[in-house]
Amino acid sequence: MFGLIGHLTSLEQARDVSRRMGYDEYADQGLEFWSSAPPQIVDEITVTSATGKVIHGRYIESCFLPEMLAARRFKTATRKVLNAMSHAQKHGIDISALGGFTSIIFENFDLASLRQVRDTTLEFERFTTGNTHTAYVICRQVEAAAKTLGIDITQATVAVVGATGDIGSAVCRWLDLKLGVGDLILTARNQERLDNLQAELGRGKILPLEAALPEADFIVWVASMPQGVVIDPATLKQPCVLIDGGYPKNLGSKVQGEGIYVLNGGVVEHCFDIDWQIMSAAEMARPERQMFACFAEAMLLEFEGWHTNFSWGRNQITIEKMEAIGEASVRHGFQPLALAI
């Protein structure tokens, strides 16, 4: 059995979704209530592969909200993630994906050192961040968008915002070794990590955000949007493709203009409908088929019987792992969300 551990994007959305899903006792509550609310299994899921194989899973709502980080309730945030993981393990779930901010919290707050959750010793091989599949899907989206717009990827400039992160660094490796992009621009906050990534790749131009964006034919955004940052569409190339790989996805509402294309990055579409409620809450265009690639990774690991923490740690994603999960993705009927023009 697979599990999907996730959360909603805001207190306002949490109230709305609770009301729609019949959790009336949650619908009118504030942050204090959500801070103490335990994890809940709120969806039972059945997925059929293109091969005909059928698997079953559960969606675990962690009851974490981003406002907890904004209010500097870091202990609350870490407790939410650990409790959700413990809940999944107690229910016998073999492999669970840490979706949204849950994997970021796990890494940034070093939760690997907090293996004991009350009477449960977490078995980390039961969990995956899903970042390998996410990185693979984003790279395929860049490749497909280039073909759609008639852009020669080997002559194109790709800027990766958040290049030193787990997903960002994997994307950079694939763009360099598999796609052979013309120019690669690396943008991130940590200069030392940028220097190390540039040395590893043997290429890549390090630029601040405001200098990087106007040079790029493709912008892969896999970082949180800094407060106060405004992207002027007039400064971007035409055409310019922005792959929004963050969560929540909001570049589409912030960057609009002639010749500017925004694509939800790290989203896949399955070949068959899935009877579930949670992707409607994620505001997918086709919630019965579309999902985050990190969630799909847990399904793929279940389909393949790979019950292991396939994506784990920071900057451990290899080209070989991306190829392996990519082959499984195709085999079981997933395809990257395509650019609509």
Curated annotation (Swiss-Prot):
Top EC class for this record: oxidoreductase
Keyword DNA repair: no
Entry protein name: Long-chain acyl-[acyl-carrier-protein] reductase
GO MF term set: oxidoreductase activity
Keyword Transmembrane helix tagged: no
Function: Catalyzes the NADP-dependent reduction of long-chain acyl-ACP to the corresponding fatty aldehyde. Involved in the biosynthesis of alkanes, mainly heptadecane and pentadecane, by producing the fatty aldehydes used by aldehyde decarbonylase.
Keyword annotations: NAD, Oxidoreductase
Enzymatic reactions: a long-chain fatty aldehyde + holo-[ACP] + NADP(+) = a long-chain fatty acyl-[ACP] + NADPH + H(+); a long-chain fatty aldehyde + holo-[ACP] + NAD(+) = a long-chain fatty acyl-[ACP] + NADH + H(+)
Entry EC no(s): 1.2.1.80
